Amino acid sequence: MRYLLILSMLGLSIFLSACGSSANSTGAKEAVEDYVNALASNDEASLSALSCADWETSALTELDSLQAVTATLDGFSCQQSGTDGETALVNCEGKMILSYNDEDQELDLSTRTYRVVEQNGNWLVCGVQ
């Protein structure tokens, strides 16, 4: 009986750990998707809210560089690719199309890996590599 109880508790803890990892992976992925969408739509308030304090200035500088263009996303999706200690690593696919004076330039979104951290229950972008 005691052996069965220990096995049940072990199974439950593994199940709950797997559920927690899935939720964390989704949270980091969604944070990056929201962050890139905020960049594309020139949404400064959302971009600030989705950035950790150490990254916010860099995020706003990147947003400033997009002020003269119209940005749209094409084939955009993200997924968590791994972790680095407490940091989730998220990669995206697709491209950001930047339009200026009827000319388009494409930015390949797969060239960046976003560093995402959880702070106070919120996933925040905290750098790129």
Give the predicted meaning of each segment.
Residues 1-8:
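Positively charged n-region of N-terminal signal peptides that target proteins for export
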Residues 20-23:
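Bacterial signal peptide processing site
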